[in-house]
Amino acid sequence: MCFGRVGAAKQDAGHGIIEPHDFWQGFEPAGAGVPAAFKDRYPATLPDGRVLNLPIRALGDSGEGIASLILTQCSFAVEEALATVLADRLRPAAPDVVVGVPTLGLPLARAVAQKLGHSRYVALGTSPKFWYDDALSVGLSSITSPEAQKRLFVDPRMLPPRKKRQ
């Protein structure tokens, strides 16, 4: 896999230039074609055929990379479309609750919960509050910052009521 300079405009033969600030801002129309090789972007295709180009980020000096979606930097139209697709896929499972992982998963979880008709969602956190219970936390690491060891907490007040045994 080949990576360009971070922050440089990207061009793929026959597919034009995507400036760094243009990623996640809109979709290519269905049938527009996608680049054959994934050098600088990955064409994520939605069920309706539209394509969201995701920049490929180098993973250190490994020669490997990941396709990146930063929801807090995408346009409202992209967030809306992704929430619709995810809600449509989740609807048959009839989830009782939607849980969002900080920070980048929170906007999507909120939008998906709304589309599913929920009155709320559960936002997990990485900053412990004095009323949190360590038993309701798990270790957390990230592919983008593997050295940072954090904990992921759920606010005990956000747990659904326990059903009584009969």
Predicted regions and their residues:
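A generic local structural motif
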Residues: 84-86, 108-109, 151-157
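Active-site-facing substrate-recognition patch
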Residues: 7, 14-95
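Short glycine-rich phosphate-binding loop at a beta-alpha junction
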Residues: 95-102
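Short, catalytically relevant binding-site loops at active-site mouths
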Residues: 104-107, 128-130
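Short, glycine/charge-rich flexible loops or terminal/linker lids adjacent to PRPP-binding catalytic cores
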Residues: 119-165
